[in-house]
Amino acid sequence: MAWQIAPLIVPERRILISLYLFMAGIILFHLMPDIWHSGRYLNWLVTVFLLTSILGLGVAIYTRQSAGHDRGLFLFVVFTAGIALASLQFALHDQPKIKWGVTADINGMLIKIDGNADARSRLWISLGATSDIVKNDILPAGGIVRVTTDKWQDQQYIGGAIAMRVRLYPPPDRILHGMPDYGRRARVNDVLASGYVISEITMMPDDHAESIMHDVKLFLARYRAGFAAHLVDLMPKPAGAIAAALLVGERRFISEDVYNRFRDSGLAHLLAISGLHMGLICFGSMAVIRFFGALFPSRSSRFALHKYAAIIAAIIGGCYVLMSGAPVSALRAFGMAMLVVLAILHDRMALTLRNVCLAAFAILAFNPVALFTASFQLSFAATAILVIWYESRARRGPAKWHWSLRYPMALITMSFLSAMATAPFAAQHFGTVTPWGLVANIIGIPLTGLWIMPVGMVLTISTLFGLDWVVAPLMTAGLDGLYYLADWIAGFPLAGWKVAPPGYSALVVMVTGVMISQLLIKPMARIGLGLVVIGGGIWAVRPVPDGVLFAVGRTPQLVLAGTNSMALSYAPLSEFLASMGELRMGQSIEQADLAKCMPACKHDFSKGISANIVMKAKGLTAACKDLETAFILTNVTPRYPCYSGKPIYNISQKTGYNYLIFIDKNKFKLINNFGSARQVCPALQPRPC
């Protein structure tokens, strides 16, 4: 069978099979029941799959003379390695967590601050040994807790010891079915609890001794925070905040309104350090070195100047990653840059899909859970599609456009391809699609690449000599232009268009299709394109919830989808829960006029049906008599059925889970946040539903 399939595969693309199986192993581990994610079962899993991977690799090497067996065994090893590394990551972060809310006095070292400029700050604190919850053996010393506060905005105390009284809760489970599991991400970051501050924050003497590596990390964090604060003070709003995001990856100074404008215009990717920024910093430096070398041809021709320039560019790129705090997007970009540098040093083709796969392998090997993050998916989707386009363009030869049109046409093509490749992932993680992103990026990318980032490099260097005030006005002008562009595009119709997420099944089918289209020879590659279309069809026909019910640890809070792409909340929602509801339903959420719903009110669904929402018991009688509605949703327990036979669904008892609500005529279906589905029977119904 292997010999029959082998001629259909493009030889240099075989690495796609390995990457696909490696990711499949990671996904399989995360699909396992929770019992396999902690304790002795997790230890067994790690042991079995690590040994299996090692033994399989040994056998594959021993039998390498038999090509078919060797390749099959190697693919098996890659698959088991995905499971082994994913389970090992969880085993290394298998620490005790609180099981319920606790109030305690804590102290520890402040290691990070994030949030938005106009919202509450979030403090990341490494617990000290004298904290109440540590002395009572609730949480271990060194564990991280995240707490929010509106009384702390100064970042200069990163690394300092602080004390406060807090209310802590366990890391959240999956909020809604089909949504990211933030609890697992918190786990791999050693975050054991989250909550909020309920007292004043006080500074404490810092008398602890740490390792050299810890001191280096602390120095970089303090530098990043201090430089970001300096940029904010140096430039007017919002230019200083945008500069901090571009140069050192500190986005907490950006207000929510400014970020929303960038997101709706399709320019939010410019605020996260990624391949664009790394390419400008790294290879821009290499170009400058080669330019000055070209001024002295007699000397520069005596040695391989381009290779020395590549090495210097790699060092500069590494410094940029450290300055930015090494987020996934920056690590991916730096990994790609290093592969390009290695290709230059070995006189090989640099931009290849193989190098993209190697960078993905490297990141996922060290952080398997990154596979499920928006940063990883968006950055690799954009990078892969651009490299695929570049390789196909290189095979076709130079473009036939006039030289003055080549750069604009290439920019338009790259922007279009990037927008198409990232749209499903943006919809999955953010619930929005930006039709005008192509227009915004045609202007925004050259503005960032040719003006803002080069001036930013000069500004960073000039800060060392106290001359940043000379360069700041020039960078401010470029940043203002970028902000005005985002503001202008965000005002267009359908900018930031709310859509329902495609779901992981559709994403898997589409990714599989893209890989097959690049793996197989041309006639068979159409199978992959067909799978991409099928994945889009799965997205199109995926049922969209008619509402959500948040009931974990709280009184049930009902949100129902409405007409004109606007959902209504029949209880006050936190900003976080509102964003989760909007993402899952693909609609904006507004607070209903609760005064009109006392004791009852009418809700219209986009399906053409209506329901009565009953908030008080005395509203049941009027709701039963309303002939224009199909059923009743009540937050109070009914004592009698409707004489008309209208179904009454009691949501007051639906506690302990968050639910997706699906309504089909008079049928009422709930899916909890763990994926368990059931049809709900009307209250007081005399016969089974």
Give the predicted meaning of each segment.
Residues 25, 108, 166, 246, ...:
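Divalent metal-coordination and catalytic microenvironments
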Residues 203-219, 225, 260, 264, ...:
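Membrane-interface amphipathic/re-entrant loop segments adjacent to transmembrane helices
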Residues 44-61, 80-85, 507-518, 531-538:
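Hydrophobic core of alpha-helical transmembrane segments in multi-pass integral membrane proteins
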Residues 2-9, 63-269, 637-642, 649-688:
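Membrane-interface helix/helix-cap signal primarily in integral membrane proteins
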Residues 33-45, 66-68, 439, 496-500:
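Membrane-helix interface and helix-disruption motif detector
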Residues 1-37, 343-344, 458-469, 476, ...:
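Hydrophobic alpha-helical segments
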Residues 37-38, 133, 151-167, 178, ...:
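Non-globular, low-confidence helical/coil segments that flank catalytic cores
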Residues 8, 17, 25, 70-72, ...:
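Hydrophobic alpha-helical transmembrane segments in multi-pass membrane proteins
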